[in-house]
Amino acid sequence: MKKQKLICAAAASAMLLASVTAFTGCGSKDNSSAEGASSAAESSSQAAAPPEKTAAVHKQNGNEFDTYQSNTYVATGNNGIVKNAESVTYRAYFPAEQYGELDYRFYFSNAVDSTYNTGAPVHVGMEVSGYTIESARIADGGTSPDDEITNYTDVTFDSEAGREVAAGDDFWSDAVKFDLPQDHYLVWEWTLTGKKIPATNMANLTSATSSVEGGDFEYCDPLPLPQLIGADRGAKYTVAAIGDSITQGCQTDFMAYEYWAAQISQKLGSDYAFWNCGLGWARSSDAAADGNWLERTKNADIVIVAFGTNDIISGEYGGDGGNSAAEIEDYIKQVIAPLKAAGSSVIVFNAPPEDYGDEQESVRTEYNAVLEQLCNDEGVYFFDFASLLCDPETPAAAKY
């Protein structure tokens, strides 16, 4: 099963790589892989673009996102809550997309991005509180969490060591120069005090620990994090992926980074900065709320929209169960519209198989049957993600 899952992720990332590089005109780190995937895409219609859609362009948003681009493929959105923290230090390890000496800045949003599970613990738009940043720093984590952490470097906020964060606040750290050796982890560490602090359900994607008042670091999930690990990389294009746990990479091996979003990030090369905005349990209705989650995603040149699974299973928060195909279509349109208005090129995935019961599978089948035409009507790209994750003879059965 694990081997089959990796094959599926590799196939999806190769096909998507061909789509992204085709309409930007830039090569990838592995051009032979992209060329082979491109030929396959042409023959199988895996990626379809409306004829009137032009090539992606590198946007100028007039804000910090123009300069500071994602430098990790680990997602750090807010789909969790820390109920109470009293001088708790949180630590996480991040693989980098680009190494060497770079200027870093970190972006934060004190808001919940998406609904988790039933929405009882956390839901989109829920009220949060203010909190205090007592200190923050980055460091060289070596090549393993077992290595000694070195080169601790303070991160400041308006030249201060800490910051008072109000409910709903979004803000940037000051710039900090840091030299990260090849294949070393970037460590993020900060000390917080507060209640109802938005956090990331990390789901085994990286080493996530916390320490209370100087005690030993122990496993911690969820944990609060910056929403962007940003660096002045000078990439020609920025790519963001907004979606659910399949995009976030949940239920994959610890710190293996074999899910499709990590694979495509590693293959795209230095012309691209990839920002993983996937969140476990997220629905298209969460993104359609047009909160900070979608707002920050609008800054990317290319946005991948990958929903369907939790829409079918759970539906929007406060609803009465899974959504119908028509309801999902409407939410997807509400996600597409502001992205297009912001000047982003959009790629929409269809819903992958999930070994559903008959009723839920009928919703997936109906939704997938109309999605390509919806994308053509909306002037965005369609990507047949589902066909890469199923056997053609049994399309309803997941092979991952």
Spans of model-derived segments:
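Sec-dependent N-terminal signal peptides
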Residues: 5-16
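C-terminal motif of bacterial Sec signal peptides marking the signal peptidase cleavage site
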Residues: 21-25
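N-terminal secretory targeting modules
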Residues: 28-242, 247-248, 252-253
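Structural motif
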Residues: 187, 304-306, 347
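Conserved SGNH/GDSL esterase-like catalytic core that processes O-acyl groups on lipids
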Residues: 236-241, 246-333, 355-357, 365
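Alpha-helical scaffolding segments of alpha/beta enzyme cores, especially the outer helices
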Residues: 327-341, 366-373
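A short helix->loop->beta-strand "cap" motif at the edges of active sites that frequently abuts
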Residues: 342-346
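Catalytic His-Asp segment of secreted/periplasmic serine-dependent ester chemistry enzymes
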Residues: 353-400
